[in-house]
Amino acid sequence: MQTLQTTSLRVADNQLFILDQQALPQEKRWLDASTVEALVGHIHALRVRGAPLIGLSASLLLALLAESGHRRDELAIALETLRAARPTAVNLMNNLDRMKQALRQEDFVPALAAEALRLIDEDKQLCDDIARAGSALVKPGSRLLTHCNTGGLATAGTGTALGVIARAYAQGNVQNVWVDETRPLLQGGRLTAWELGELGVPYQLITDSMAASLMAKGLVDAVWVGADRIAANGDVANKIGTYSLAVLAKFHGIPFYVAAPQTTLDPHCPNGDAIPIEQRAAGEVTGVAGSFGAVQWAPENAQVYNPAFDVTPAALISGWVLDSGVVTPEDVAKGVFRTEAA
């Protein structure tokens, strides 16, 4: 396969490398991800993360394994193992469905490579399309609040919600970005803050519990988040804490937008209750670990509830910004997401 480079993915010498997102921002470190075991381990450890990026990394790995001589039956097993790596992220399922079609072709080796590269190119384009559609909703002088990380670290392109923010800033319409630290793994404080700094976008880092105070003081004009899965009724699964922001935004009369590619839609999932929610390790809540070391602050025997995602009901969402354009609550009520199954 040809040499390839995105913010978080690299293909060189027929090997796949991922940018270790657990090491950022203290260290920029590339890790080998050229086996199924390695990539699944990186996904579980969130060294590679973001729904679009997970799907793209799995697709690239399958193509590279095919080129290295793996048989069709071996690739089919690898595909199913990768599919199970992150159950909430539907982009992974959608991308691998396309790779499965390529695997069925007689000349499957070049077909897999072509499909993986096509997915990369499509992701870059849809990020641009999302940014174009979403930035039109950002008014001059906006103070925006965002959660988790939805930029180039999570995609092959400029990002989803963060791509909208970056484009709106380039157009002169963003005054400031409030960045939720995003407990427990601090994707906002570590990754989004780093990306905005690299882009030169003014931001202020806050703890998750400060959002309500900011909204009450009139310091937030809109909330922008990404999505790991969008159900047919418009419910959205995203990083834990998203639902809280949506409730707060609704109470304070602040627009709440979800930016995501069409690959995040799951028209076969009727509503948020049907979305599987990944439960993660207690250690993520009882302490913190990173390239700086590890600290535990909770008692050794503390019992922990640690879902990676929550579900935001469609009734709390002002608009879904896709690469195909802006979808309104009225559109969703008419079943626009359900028709995607046709």
Swiss-Prot record:
Disulfide bonds: none annotated. One of its GO terms (biological process) is L-methionine salvage from methylthioadenosine. Gene3D superfamilies: translation initiation factor eif-2b, domain 1 (1.20.120.420), Translation initiation factor eif-2b, domain 2 (3.40.50.10470). It comes from the Bacteria. It catalyses: 5-(methylsulfanyl)-alpha-D-ribose 1-phosphate = 5-(methylsulfanyl)-D-ribulose 1-phosphate. Keywords: Amino-acid biosynthesis, Isomerase, Methionine biosynthesis. Substrate binds at residues 49-51, 86, 187, 238-239. Its EC number is 5.3.1.23. Coiled coil: none annotated. Pathway: Amino-acid biosynthesis; L-methionine biosynthesis via salvage pathway; L-methionine from S-methyl-5-thio-alpha-D-ribose 1-phosphate: step 1/6. The record marks 148 as: Transition state stabilizer. The active site is at 228 (proton donor). One of its GO terms (molecular function) is S-methyl-5-thioribose-1-phosphate isomerase activity. NCBIfam families: eIF-2B_rel, PRK05720.1, salvage_mtnA. Belongs to the eIF-2B alpha/beta/delta subunits family. MtnA subfamily. Catalyzes the interconversion of methylthioribose-1-phosphate (MTR-1-P) into methylthioribulose-1-phosphate (MTRu-1-P). This is Methylthioribose-1-phosphate isomerase. The gene is mtnA.
